[in-house]
Design a protein with these regions (language model features):
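Large intracellular
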Residues: 4-127, 199-222
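Helix-termination/interfacial motifs at the ends of transmembrane alpha-helices
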Residues: 1-12, 116-195
Length: 222
């Protein structure tokens, strides 16, 4: 962002104002922490990081994997999946494979994995809610900073040197608030919502395929 501003007018430094940053980002953080618990806030940051850093498998890739697993099961039984458990990076699928290897029945597997999906949905919904709150509080803090800057400016009209810094606080807090909301918070919120939908669909696909293998289904059907 600052790089773009630097290209436009050759000086990104004029868009950096420490008091404005403290008002917007510090104020937003404080209000968000008052609204929710520390664990929820940390969880929201963590789930956002995982959403950007750990891409989900494509459904097509999962289907190909299950065709291989189903063929293995038809040849050598469920115990043959034990060699695949340690290789599996998808924690949800890995947990399912472990239960199949342990001989858990279909109802047990479905219940446990459905609970895992429900927990994942709650985690993502909480994260999205907190990022939505940050998006709401950011512009509000920007408006507060603008009012603070205007009050400082009007209170020192007799001193021309103080008008510039006060006006900078007034304008830049509005800019920072809009930036925090529309460039950071709301995009992350939407990312979490989409991630939740995609991960839920993947989990449903995995559960269906695991149950299919438990029923002794033909790999060609997959």
């Amino acid at each position: 962002f600052l790089g773009v501003l630097n290209i436009i007018n050759g000086s990104a430094g004029m868009f950096v104002n420490i008091p404005s940053l403290i008002i917007v980002f510090g104020g937003t953080l404080m209000v968000t922490m008052m609204r929710s618990s520390m664990s929820d806030f940390v969880g929201a940051v963590g789930v956002a990081g995982r959403s950007f850093g750990n891409p989900l498998e494509k459904p097509e890739a999962l289907i190909e994997k299950f065709v291989e697993y189903a063929e293995l099961v038809r040849k050598d039984g469920m115990i043959a999946l034990e060699s695949k458990v340690s290789e599996e990076k998808n924690e949800y699928l890995k947990r399912g494979l472990e239960m199949l290897v342990d001989g858990k029945d279909k109802g047990y597997v479905s219940t446990q994995l459905t609970k895992d999906t429900e927990i994942m949905v709650i985690r993502h919904e909480r994260g999205a809610d907190i990022w939505s709150a940050i998006g709401d509080f950011g512009p509000a803090m920007g408006m507060i900073g603008t009012l603070v800057g205007l009050v400082q400016m009007l209170a020192n009209m007799s001193d021309p040197k103080s008008i510039g810094p006060a006006m900078a606080v007034a304008l830049l807090t509005t800019l920072y608030g809009a930036f925090l909301a529309n460039v950071i918070a709301f995009p992350i919120q939407q990312k979490l919502k989409q991630r939740m939908v995609d991960e839920t669909l993947n989990n449903e696909l995995i559960l269906t395929a695991l149950n299919f293998m438990q029923d002794g289904g033909n790999p060609r059907v997959l």
